[in-house]
Amino acid sequence: SHFEEKLTISLERDLINWDKIIEFRERRHLIVHNSSIVNKKYISRTKNPFNFKIGEIIHIDNTYFINALKEFKLGGQLLLFNCWGNWDKENIDSALYEIMIQTFEDLKVKNYETVIKTCKYSEKITARNEQQEDIIFRVNINKAIALKKLKNNAELSKTLKNIQVGTASPIFKIAFQILNDNHNGLIDNFKKAIILDEINIDYYLEWPIFDFVRENEELHFQLLQTFKNN
């Protein structure tokens, strides 16, 4: 491909499903240029994963459209990060920061599979300074949140074993406790985080990590009181 051969940019084939993207493209061509009718070109280019017959009318439903958007988004993001890392090596900190932001934004819209794949991409990056270590730490937290949302407990357990919060600030200890379903001392850590301005009521009501405690009515009430009293 042009990216791999001319630009030496990896297509991240282990994370991006290029066969799906090819099928998305060819289906679009059919709809726009061939009255949605399946032809030989579509079948030969896509290997016909849906077993359509020549002459059959092709459609796009809501689920298909959303899945296509997610795959295009993932592919675009990872290619962008690869280009950034190869062409602007002096600003790797900024690229890593953007990875963290994108995983957080995907968590907010419940795009958990994209979060996990983007985080797996970040695992290929070796931190070279304290700031990069901090960002990668946050990315790993986002990965753990996505795994917990998907109830992938086996992968979640592996991820949590690689997260060390011994000397971390209260907000990260809170996240680690929540991800481990450990609520002992959680309110005390919230009080510390509030004092340090690491969290406020708006963050608590917005951030995906706190979905897991907001679902617990008693604990949620106690935490709301904690914000009122501190």
Predicted regions and their residues:
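Flexible secondary-structure boundary motifs
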Residues: 1-51, 77
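Short aromatic/hydrophobic-glycine micro-motifs
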Residues: 9, 218-219
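A broadly tuned "polar low-complexity/structure-edge" signature
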Residues: 29, 203-204
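Polyanionic, low-complexity intrinsically disordered segments
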Residues: 34-159, 163-172, 176-188, 192-202, ...
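Extended, amphipathic alpha-helical scaffolds
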Residues: 210-213
